[in-house]
């Protein structure tokens, strides 16, 4: 029915937002790690 359609959409949106947020957090960690590694390679401290 209409309600289940709406609920499904809401749940999908929540999951999508959650995944986007987690992706952003993980992405930031990866970027930070990458910057750290690049920095120590440049300085020769790895």
Curated annotation (Swiss-Prot):
It comes from Odorrana grahami. Keywords: Antibiotic, Antimicrobial, Secreted. Belongs to the frog skin active peptide (FSAP) family. Esculentin subfamily. Expressed by the skin glands. The keyword Isomerase does not apply. Its main location: secreted. This is Esculentin-1GRa. Pfam families: Antimicrobial_2. The keyword Ubl conjugation does not apply. GO terms for cellular component: extracellular region. GO terms for biological process: defense response to Gram-negative bacterium; defense response to Gram-positive bacterium; killing of cells of another organism. InterPro entries: Antimicrobial_frog_2 (IPR012521). It is found in: Secreted. Antimicrobial peptide active against the Gram-positive bacterium S.aureus (MIC=12.5 uM) and against the Gram-negative bacterium E.coli (MIC=6 uM). Has no antifungal activity against C.albicans. Shows hemolytic activity against human erythrocytes only at high concentrations (LC(50)=210 uM).
